[in-house]
Amino acid sequence: MVSWGRFICLVLVTMATLSLARPSFSLVEDTTLEPEEPPTKYQISQPEAYVVAPGESLELQCMLKDAAVISWTKDGVHLGPNNRTVLIGEYLQIKGATPRDSGLYACTAARTVDSETWIFMVNVTDAISSGDDEDDTDSSEDVVSENRSNQRAPYWTNTEKMEKRLHACPAANTVKFRCPAGGNPTSTMRWLKNGKEFKQEHRIGGYKVRNQHWSLIMESVVPSDKGNYTCLVENEYGSINHTYHLDVVERSPHRPILQAGLPANASTVVGGDVEFVCKVYSDAQPHIQWIKHVEKNGSKNGPDGLPYLKVLKAAGVNTTDKEIEVLYIRNVTFEDAGEYTCLAGNSIGISFHSAWLTVLPAPVREKEITASPDYLEIAIYCIGVFLIACMVVTVIFCRMKTTTKKPDFSSQPAVHKLTKRIPLRRQVTVSAESSSSMNSNTPLVRITTRLSSTADTPMLAGVSEYELPEDPKWEFPRDKLTLGKPLGEGCFGQVVMAEAVGIDKDKPKEAVTVAVKMLKDDATEKDLSDLVSEMEMMKMIGKHKNIINLLGACTQDGPLYVIVEYASKGNLREYLRARRPPGMEYSYDINRVPEEQMTFKDLVSCTYQLARGMEYLASQKCIHRDLAARNVLVTENNVMKIADFGLARDINNIDYYKKTTNGRLPVKWMAPEALFDRVYTHQSDVWSFGVLMWEIFTLGGSPYPGIPVEELFKLLKEGHRMDKPTNCTNELYMMMRDCWHAVPSQRPTFKQLVEDLDRILTLTTNEEYLDLTQPLEQYSPSYPDTSSSCSSGDDSVFSPDPMPYEPCLPQYPHINGSVKT
């Protein structure tokens, strides 16, 4: 029985041969194809696979019937009889098979009316793969002859091969790192993993070091192979080193995925050019062909029901993926009209998309009416002079109209205080289908400017005073509000703790601890506008158990105070980190033992509460746009409350490469459509909710640790997603993956998430404590490697940025306790 390792090796070799076994194609040559060439029936089926041990005989039988002539090819090259190859009828026999006989074999049966091809995939296995050095055909470049008398320290001989530092590849693939170097005397090479010596016993299956090629080879990589690999080259005159980072992506095998809408229907005129594009995504090496549907004797299908097809373009030995994904047709004729198909296959299956080409007759050129060049030039000059004259008259008229006599302030004995009312308009974040009756253009305050005399000051002073309208429903007396200690500084102000007497109308004489948002001393008009907009947004949203609710405001006779609910246990991210068990590799404080150990049900409860809060915001047509654990607060009774949903954000001026004050990148919570197209919807909030779930089940982990922003953009476009957290069931992880669906319409709604989480929470017992100290399974497709955990104490071993207090949120003391609904 073939072992799993040999089976994986077979699949890899098979897909490699698929990419090499297609004859090269030139479109210019295709235009000269003889029209009487019989069409080929394309066999859309799984090729037969043969596995032969070295030294054995390989025998293939062509299963095609009624063949006048049978011809054989290997990797697109015709096969003839020799001392090892025997051709007898429909049989092909190769004696003493070697690994070089591996490849793609095809038999073609030529008939009087058509031809048909049958494909075989052959793999001659060997104990040690002979393909380790397939990329080393240019190894002569790495060997540098040194003059014996020219002693020198090590140096790199081929830096072009070392430019790609970050390598992301699917699991079970082979990875090779190279460090071509020279030096005299001859240098030695050692490899380190994560700064420590890399030994054979550190990896199941070991690894290979090819000193003559300065390379490290790891076969069948798994998630535990993630990390930094450093080659250290040294001799007695010095040493040099180079580091690669490997990220292993565990993904389920699937047939090729073709981008929707490609290739697209096209139309052109006779003599024009056209191109069809086919975007193929596949973990395994895909084989791509371009096919045209043709007719034979007025029929598109043969007697057996199979369509008549002609292969126009296929991958050859020197063809790249980018070249094969585009089909160019030059100097189009009416015969080129018809249906074209892009077909891609791998070892899992086949996918195809079709498009139609419509050829139109060339338009008849109308007789050009040419005006006299003299009259045309005169007309241009006249129009230009007229436009310039109009501009000059307009400028003079505007200046005469706006010129007024300026007041002489030096003759006035008193100082004038400028009282300015800031023009604010409602800046609410609502979806396009919002049916709110409140007009977003209704002005909150109209601008007025007046000069008032005061004789107490000796010189002019410009003082801005903000006059806001009073809202009786929300206005709270200042004399009943006692400010306390600061809790933190926000984006446009600060937050302090306070005691509000009578803010709870059911208990008019009882003091309630609240949080008060206010402007800083150096606040600008924009800061005031943002704070008022947030207050107005919270008024419109209303109250819910799982959001930070507005309690009141002080807008008259003093600075603006916005009074909101107080959450004593701070933000959710630090709340989870403070409750990480001791001994956990990424423990927040390894010397502190938590008073209560969190259960799996506690984490599900956190997720359920936040889903309820987002369901309510979505029902109020509110799009959050910055949903993350740092923007969730926890109350004394462990109730999750979503914060900062009313902040005004300028989505057109986001610096996607700029870190926040705590060193983390907000783009890691953003959906692809928000990241690349700046489209914010409820579906983009669902994506962020999936990342928030991942933060919860990693107990405050940082998403995509150590991945640069540029690489993150690339990985998201390629379909990469984060692995399953340790403390997460497959059902919850699939819920995260649904939230991260590339198509926004395919993501679940918050209503569906609430229903699913409610069911999971009901079936979960209270005794399921988190056992985070157990080692992770090295070959599990959903568990990351413990040696390179994605949630280390400082968020990432690759990002040494410090973690100060959260921006826009207060810092609260941590109080242990389980999470309850």
Swiss-Prot record:
Disruption phenotype: Embryonic lethality shortly after implantation, due to trophoblast defects, absence of a functional placenta, failure of limb bud formation, plus defects in lung branching and heart development. It comes from Mus musculus. GO terms for biological process: angiogenesis; animal organ morphogenesis; axonogenesis; bone development; bone mineralization; bone morphogenesis; branch elongation involved in salivary gland morphogenesis; branching involved in labyrinthine layer morphogenesis. The keyword NAD does not apply. This is Fibroblast growth factor receptor 2. The second and third Ig-like domains directly interact with fibroblast growth factors (FGF) and heparan sulfate proteoglycans. Alternative splicing events affecting the third Ig-like domain are crucial for ligand selectivity. ATP binds at L487, G488, E489, G490, C491, F492, G493, Q494, V495, K517, E565, Y566, A567, N571. It comes from the Eukaryota. Residues 131-144 have a biased composition (Acidic residues). GO terms for molecular function: ATP binding; fibroblast growth factor binding; fibroblast growth factor receptor activity; heparin binding. Disulfide bonds join C62-C107, C179-C231, C278-C342. The chain crosses the membrane at residues 378-398. Residues 161-178 are annotated as: Heparin-binding. Tyrosine-protein kinase that acts as a cell-surface receptor for fibroblast growth factors and plays an essential role in the regulation of cell proliferation, differentiation, migration and apoptosis, and in the regulation of embryonic development. Required for normal embryonic patterning, trophoblast function, limb bud development, lung morphogenesis, osteogenesis and skin development. Plays an essential role in the regulation of osteoblast differentiation, proliferation and apoptosis, and is required for normal skeleton development. Present in an inactive conformation in the absence of bound ligand. Ligand binding leads to dimerization and activation by autophosphorylation on tyrosine residues. The active site is at D626 (proton acceptor). Autophosphorylated. Binding of FGF family members together with heparan sulfate proteoglycan or heparin promotes receptor dimerization and autophosphorylation on tyrosine residues. Autophosphorylation occurs in trans between the two FGFR molecules present in the dimer. Residues 129-151 are annotated as: Disordered. Belongs to the protein kinase superfamily. Tyr protein kinase family. Fibroblast growth factor receptor subfamily. Residues 399-821 are cytoplasmic. The lineage of its organism: Eukaryota, Metazoa, Chordata, Craniata, Vertebrata. Residues 1-21 form the signal peptide. Keywords: Apoptosis, ATP-binding, Cell membrane, Cytoplasmic vesicle, Disulfide bond, Glycoprotein, Golgi apparatus, Heparin-binding, Immunoglobulin domain, Kinase, Membrane, Nucleotide-binding, Phosphoprotein, Proto-oncogene, Receptor, Repeat, Signal, Transferase, Transmembrane, Transmembrane helix, Tyrosine-protein kinase, Ubl conjugation. The gene is Fgfr2. The modification Phosphoserine is found at S780.
